[in-house]
């Protein structure tokens, strides 16, 4: 690993990104699996091992030997059968190559990130990794804005577009050829996938490689924001021409170069907004602006044109929803967020004259979307589509304590994740569904009715692990009010949540 980092830190590497030799090193594939090659065993399919117990070290050596045979790595457009490792499991080889490529290509980007943080003297903060850290930002900023665009980043992406995207970062032709080969082999071996050449093809079997491809694609989608925010008002025509070239407007460059700089200033002025904020999580992003409705519509039109021309795909305008914050809430990270106007009347009196002052205070609110969450619980077999609790099917060998722990963990996680809700009624209903579903599951296991089961064990049987959240709140807010009343009012954002809740992710 130190040898690899030493080579990557060389100035020549930073200019050329020559990654191809590392794909022929065994330790790269060991890093891909997170252990040494003599550790956990990685087996090929039985038909390729001749029923012998071969370790992953031998498998990697065989793969590297096949990769050295350049005549079998030639990509042919006319005959797809030539794009194969002849006589071997193509799917398995392509998967291993993609895993190794993900390890190699991540290192230069991580080094670039570390150097960028050091240059800007940005201190690392683990609290900023929390998903909940986004909502205090919303509370501070969105109450002063007018419009929000709910954006879904376009997908699926053709495999060739992904290779071209990486080509703009990595000037290493052999590595890109090998990556292209493994991508198409991976796709050809998945005949059950209906969305051909889709980036979602690798989401289950090779998550590390999928995350790298998806992040590179999202970075390209966000390139327009980075460009426009960095440019001043007096933009040169040369800079704007290079931007257009990147978005593949080749036919328009010759005409636009001769346009006066004032026209570019007017064009950029349409998108210049000092009160614009952008937030993204996975494939969904929020673009909020204080400007007029016309400005946000121009952003929508520009984004659609940019994605269509840059990625050669049809980007539906319906994937970008423009909403007014005062009238329409937007869904993000499992919350329905909105800005509500709280009006209040103040009576003032000066000498013998009295008058009233009507004031409106903007308040950012987040609530739990009860209907989508019930639908997610119904998919997980906790209730039906109407929200009526049902018994959850479990293995017969599970003990009562194990079933209780599972239900309790799910309930606590949901309470923990949705602790920032302004109104807790929806969350209490979800707790009720889980509590009654747990009781139905246990009574079904003991072949009894719910009433007889709870009567035998007492109503306090399900109270202990469902009230741990309120007990935790009593430690955070040690006041005289009761924990249940306090939890109904307080909105809490935890800084230890690094991923979205599983049930919320189904929405």
Swiss-Prot record:
PANTHER family: MATURASE K. It comes from the Eukaryota. Pfam families: Intron_maturas2, MatK_N. The lineage of its organism: Eukaryota, Viridiplantae, Streptophyta, Embryophyta, Tracheophyta. Usually encoded in the trnK tRNA gene intron. Probably assists in splicing its own and other chloroplast group II introns. Belongs to the intron maturase 2 family. MatK subfamily. GO terms for cellular component: chloroplast. Keywords: Chloroplast, mRNA processing, Plastid, RNA-binding, tRNA processing. This is Maturase K. It is found in: Plastid, Chloroplast. GO terms for biological process: mRNA processing; RNA splicing; tRNA processing.
